[in-house]
């Protein structure tokens, strides 16, 4: 089946597409870079209607891949606000591993990866917590886990896109400006994801697709499959659809890490018997090591949809979505843990025999005696399960009055029932050395008189059991009316209600009423028995070679560590664990009124909207505070409200040029990790400290301004420029400050029995509202098919976009004092995407590159550094497809062809490595068939 573009003879066109398996893979990959989609279902219906009515209109027919690009251009032109989109009409034709991989093609969107695939997005320099995601019109959160260096479990408001198979979705919309009829919560963007529906297709549709993937680093093959069946009944008044997507994936990730760098004077300093003097201010790696992660992932997604349209005036839609993402992970490493520890087996016992301190004051080379070496084996079983259902109703009482109603519920559960780490130590190793001089990212590690592949001589040190669970639940109800007062003005108004629950639970070994315990009794296993419970692993990165690590599965069988009995019983109410167990409920009531306008001023067509949204939030946060070593239940209730005006205007000053202006006041609620009411109180003599979350935080609040100009030329060509500015009035940071307890808002019961009073001064470490700062930037996008060239060359085309963002945020030091301004966390100053494609009716090819510059992960950094960050990345993907006929096609795709490494660092002056890992290249050979 071919793409068909039907151009009505009107000033602004909505093009109709019929997207088939033969070409859609190519269409999606480029649409993702610079496409826009109407924000309303009515716009999508209008596009479908234009296709159905094309026989009665004067038309110009364009087939193939270019039709999809021209549709994207027309949609961008017709919108009042600033949006970009990816549109599909068949499940089997989504080319990227997941949704984040496709969204990164859109101007201003950058991604972070986990296990070699996209996990989170940032929009215009604003991180995942500033972007709201809706699925089929309903706000939701999806949560997965990750390695410790990549941030671990998502405990915040950010959306993890790797939960879902990309083939489940037919439309992705990134809305960069605000309007009153779109619920609040975003400083960056609102992303709408829509699954396929039966009326998207013409009658009976059955499509299947399959791929066989290969990961070159893991040397593993991985299957991937899709299935869709859809039909309409009762003279096209009723439709039903079912789709299924499945992926099995094995990825190997390996490289070096340091768990940060610290000063030589920390943890008691090196042994005074050292023969090489290390300055106390010199920085050294805390835990130098090579890591190996084996990710085994299985992803299943199912969507179901029923549409009932008894007349042109009424439509009822049911959407259901289920997804399960199983991600089991093995982590193996051998390391010099002594550099991060105190005591006789820690740094004070290490004798420095030789070393080199470079010009940045870093101990980049050293030879050491009496070093404690650690071998760690960790295994995680992780499941992210998501289910959602919703009903939506549209009814036109007349040509002038429309009702829209929506009710839905969604639940996301991340469950990590097995997080087990088995640790063995070997003491007194002499001649250990590390060398970062030749390669600062892939050092040379030598273990002196110890053979790292010898299983004998180890001592069992710890068995860590840390199950974890995060649950997010949303219930939504919305109702709104739209009255078309004239051809030039429509008045909208409505109300919505949202109930959101968030819960974190974690467990550990120990006795209720006591603390978490991770050590094991001496003699639990003998040295000989331990040797039988070790296994070998190999790391190719940096020539690390072979070493032994505790075999978690063997330990589980031998000791019953997962049986939940004896010393391996886990509890959630341990004194040093309970404060991290928490629950948050948000009850949100919203109201809006908005006017949509569309009129001519002389020869200029002016359209847009102006409105205001009022939102009232009631927050109830429950947790545990540790008082005198005993967990005490704590509850904090907070209420706040916001009035958010918005304005969007598009002026067509000529047939080919559109000017845009948008302004709004916006807000993002505090990240969920900040809202823990739990507090740990310590009173020791005159030292009084409180460590706590802060449920009384105000939201992030900002004023935004957008300006843009777009020039449309040729067949589907566009050159656009957009500038944006955000004045962030209220920001949130964690700080330390000293003030009376009475000013904290915490209950007096927390300090009962400590001897302190509410008038005493305490040192508080908690999140606080801070002044914020400014964010500004611009986007440039260029798209053009080369139809003006002769012969073979006319089938080529290009898409390019570039985004520049800058920010000045006032940060606080670890003592609460203001420091110099710095960039916003997660902000890449420069980002660009480029795609060169070739497309005709038989053959399609593309190569795409996505770049983001370095960005900060934490300001100030740990270990008394200025910041921590991630280095720039540039990923390159390519694909080929061949259409045998309108039903059957084959494809070949290559992802991360340059094998880009993930490079995290600490201290901007020293540029010291934290983690440096890669996952290799991936190739996929696939087919698509439509019956």
Give the predicted meaning of each segment:
Residues 164, 182-183, 198-204, 234-238, ...:
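Short loop/turn motifs that connect adjacent beta-strands in outer-membrane beta-barrel proteins
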Residues 378, 384-386, 580-586, 667-728, ...:
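Outer-membrane beta-barrel signature, preferentially recognizing the C-terminal barrel domain
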Residues 59-94, 120, 143, 147-152:
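N-terminal periplasmic "start-of-domain" segments of outer-membrane beta-barrel proteins
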Residues 100-147, 176:
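Extracytoplasmic beta-strand/coil segments of soluble accessory domains associated
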Residues 725-727, 744-859, 898:
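Gram-negative outer-membrane beta-barrel transporters
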Residues 151-159, 167-174, 181-275, 286, ...:
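Outer-membrane beta-barrel translocator/receptor signature
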Residues 727-729, 850-860, 881-931:
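C-terminal beta-signal and adjacent terminal beta-strands/loops
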Residues 307-311, 319, 396-400, 408-410, ...:
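Structural signature of Gram-negative outer-membrane beta-barrels, strongest in the C-terminal barrel
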């Amino acid at each position: 089946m071919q793409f068909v573009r039907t151009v009505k003879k009107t000033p602004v066109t909505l093009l109709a597409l019929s997207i088939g398996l033969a070409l859609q893979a190519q269409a999606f990959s480029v649409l993702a870079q610079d496409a826009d989609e109407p924000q309303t279902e009515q716009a999508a219906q209008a596009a479908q209607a234009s296709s159905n009515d094309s026989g009665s209109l004067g038309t110009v027919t364009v087939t193939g891949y270019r039709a999809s690009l021209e549709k994207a251009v027309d949609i961008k032109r017709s919108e009042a606000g600033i949006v970009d989109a990816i549109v599909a009409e068949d499940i089997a034709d989504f080319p990227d591993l997941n949704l984040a991989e496709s969204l990164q093609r859109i101007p201003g969107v950058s991604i972070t990866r986990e296990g070699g695939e996209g996990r989170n997005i940032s929009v215009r320099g604003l991180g995942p917590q500033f972007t709201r995601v809706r699925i089929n019109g309903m706000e939701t959160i999806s949560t997965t886990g990750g390695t410790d260096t990549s941030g671990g479990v998502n405990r915040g408001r950010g959306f993890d896109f790797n939960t879902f198979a990309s083939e489940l979705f037919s439309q992705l919309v990134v809305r960069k400006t605000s309007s009153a009829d779109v619920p609040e919560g975003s400083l960056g963007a609102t992303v709408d994801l829509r699954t396929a529906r039966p009326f998207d297709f013409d009658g009976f549709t059955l499509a299947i697709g399959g791929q066989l993937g290969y990961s070159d680093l893991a040397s593993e093959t991985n299957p991937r499959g899709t299935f869709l069946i859809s039909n309409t009944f009762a003279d096209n008044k009723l439709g039903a659809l079912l789709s299924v997507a499945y992926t099995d994936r094995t990825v190997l990730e390996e490289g070096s890490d340091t768990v940060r760098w610290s000063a030589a004077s920390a943890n008691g300093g090196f042994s005074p018997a050292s023969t090489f003097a290390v300055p106390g201010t010199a920085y050294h790696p805390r835990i130098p090591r090579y890591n190996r992660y084996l990710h085994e992932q299985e992803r299943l997604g199912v969507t179901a949809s029923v549409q009932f349209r008894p007349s042109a005036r009424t439509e009822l839609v049911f959407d259901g979505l289920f997804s399960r993402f199983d991600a089991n992970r093995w982590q193996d490493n051998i390391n010099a843990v002594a550099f991060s520890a105190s005591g006789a087996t820690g740094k004070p016992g290490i004798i420095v025999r030789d070393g080199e301190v470079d010009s940045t004051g870093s101990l980049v080379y050293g030879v050491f005696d009496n070093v404690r070496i650690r071998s760690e084996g960790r295994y995680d079983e992780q499941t992210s399960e998501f289910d959602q259902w919703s009903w939506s109703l549209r009814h036109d009482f007349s040509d002038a009055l429309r009702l829209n109603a929506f009710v839905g519920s969604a639940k996301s559960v991340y469950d990590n029932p097995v997080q087990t780490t088995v640790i063995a130590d070997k003491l007194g190793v002499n001649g250990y050395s590390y060398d970062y001089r030749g390669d600062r990212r892939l050092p040379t590690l030598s273990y002196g008189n110890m053979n790292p592949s010898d299983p004998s001589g180890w001592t069992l040190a710890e068995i860590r059991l840390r199950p974890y669970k995060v649950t997010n639940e949303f219930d939504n109800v919305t109702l709104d009316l739209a009255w078309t007062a004239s051809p030039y003005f429509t008045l909208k108004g409505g109300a919505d209600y949202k109930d959101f629950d968030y819960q974190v639970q974690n467990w550990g070994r120990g006795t209720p009423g006591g603390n978490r315990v991770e050590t094991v009794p001496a003699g639990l296993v003998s040295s000989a028995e331990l040797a039988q419970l070790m296994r070998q692993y190999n790391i190719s990165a940096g020539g690390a070679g072979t070493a032994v690590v505790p075999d978690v599965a063997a330990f589980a069988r031998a000791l019953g560590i997962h049986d939940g009995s004896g010393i391996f019983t886990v509890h959630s109410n341990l004194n040093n664990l309970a404060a991290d167990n928490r629950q948050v409920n948000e009850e949100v009531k919203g109201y809006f009124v908005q006017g949509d306008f569309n009129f001519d001023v002389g020869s200029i067509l002016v359209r847009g909207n102006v409105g205001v949204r009022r939102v009232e939030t009631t927050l109830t946060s429950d947790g545990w505070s540790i008082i005198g070593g005993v967990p005490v239940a704590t509850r904090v209730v907070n209420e706040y409200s916001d009035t958010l005006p918005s304005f969007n205007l598009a002026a067509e000053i000529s047939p080919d040029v559109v000017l845009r202006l948008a302004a709004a006041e916006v807000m993002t609620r505090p990240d969920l990790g900040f809202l823990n009411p739990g507090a740990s109180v310590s009173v020791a003599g005159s030292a009084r400290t409180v460590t706590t979350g802060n449920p009384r935080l105000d939201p992030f609040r900002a004023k935004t301004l957008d300006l843009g100009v777009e020039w449309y030329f040729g067949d589907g060509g566009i050159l656009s420029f957009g500038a944006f500015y955000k004045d962030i009035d209220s920001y949130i940071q964690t700080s330390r400050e000293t003030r009376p307890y009475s000013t904290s808002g915490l209950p007096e019961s927390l300090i009962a029995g400590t001897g302190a009073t509410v008038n005493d001064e305490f040192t508080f470490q908690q999140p606080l509202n801070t002044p914020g700062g400014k964010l500004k930037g611009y986007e440039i996008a260029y798209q053009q098919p080369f139809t003006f060239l002769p012969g073979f060359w006319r089938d080529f085309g290009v898409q390019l976009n570039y985004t520049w963002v800058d920010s000045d945020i006032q940060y606080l030091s670890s003592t609460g004092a203001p420091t110099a301004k710095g960039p916003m966390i997660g902000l890449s100053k420069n980002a660009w995407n480029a795609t060169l494609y070739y497309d005709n009716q038989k053959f399609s090819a593309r190569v795409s590159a996505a770049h983001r510059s370095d960005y900060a992960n934490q300001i100030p950094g740990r270990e008394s550094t200025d910041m921590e960050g991630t280095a720039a990345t540039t990923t390159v993907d390519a694909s080929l497809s061949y259409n045998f006929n309108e039903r059957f096609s084959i494809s070949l795709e290559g992802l991360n062809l340059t094998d880009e490494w993930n490079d995290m660092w600490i201290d901007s002056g020293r540029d010291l490595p934290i983690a440096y890992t890669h996952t290799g290249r991936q190739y996929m050979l696939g087919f698509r068939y439509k019956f």
